[in-house]
A protein has these predicted regions:
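Conserved S-adenosyl-L-methionine
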Residues: 65-76
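A generic structural signal for secondary-structure junctions
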Residues: 42, 56, 61, 85-89, ...
Length: 147
């Protein structure tokens, strides 16, 4: 989960992942979505990029050694507040001013927020379990099967 965006040559990383995967095995990855959400959070987490589903498909479609099983955006219900928070944070350079890691998560105290986020993720998970795809989100989930 959330590894490919940390590698400068993402195609090389995916090719190696595919190479070491056993036949008929499944690969499940998640990556951050949409460069429009780029913020200091990505910088301090050493991300090289954020993706669109089309780009993840292209990474895995470089050879005919497997097939996509399922792909979707997720963290959809959080997209609008995160988009707004990151735009304001970028404009005011808030990420650089925060103490600690500078991560988005440091801007909020744990507690009630964790409970709310947990319930949101459980709700989205129940939808994803039915193989319903979200049209946008903060992250991408991609499932691939090697032939």
């Amino acid at each position: 989960f959330d590894v490919i965006e940390h590698v400068e040559d993402d195609q090389l990383a995916v090719n190696e992942l595919k190479r070491v995967t056993k036949n008929n095995a499944l690969v499940l990855i998640t990556v951050p979505a949409f460069m429009s959400l780029w913020s200091h959070h990505d910088v301090i987490n050493h991300h090289f990029k954020r993706y669109k589903i089309k780009e993840v498909n292209q990474l895995f479609d470089s050879t005919s050694d497997g097939k996509k099983v399922f792909d979707t955006y997720f963290n959809t219900l959080l997209f609008s507040p995160i988009y707004f928070f990151r735009k304001v944070s970028n404009l005011l350079k808030l990420g650089e001013k925060r103490k600690g890691s500078g991560s988005d998560f440091e801007a909020f105290k744990p507690g009630v927020l964790n409970t709310i986020l947990y319930k949101i993720m459980c709700f989205e998970s129940s939808i994803l379990n039915k193989k319903i795809r979200f049209p946008f989100g903060v992250s991408i989930m991609y499932n691939w099967k090697k032939n």
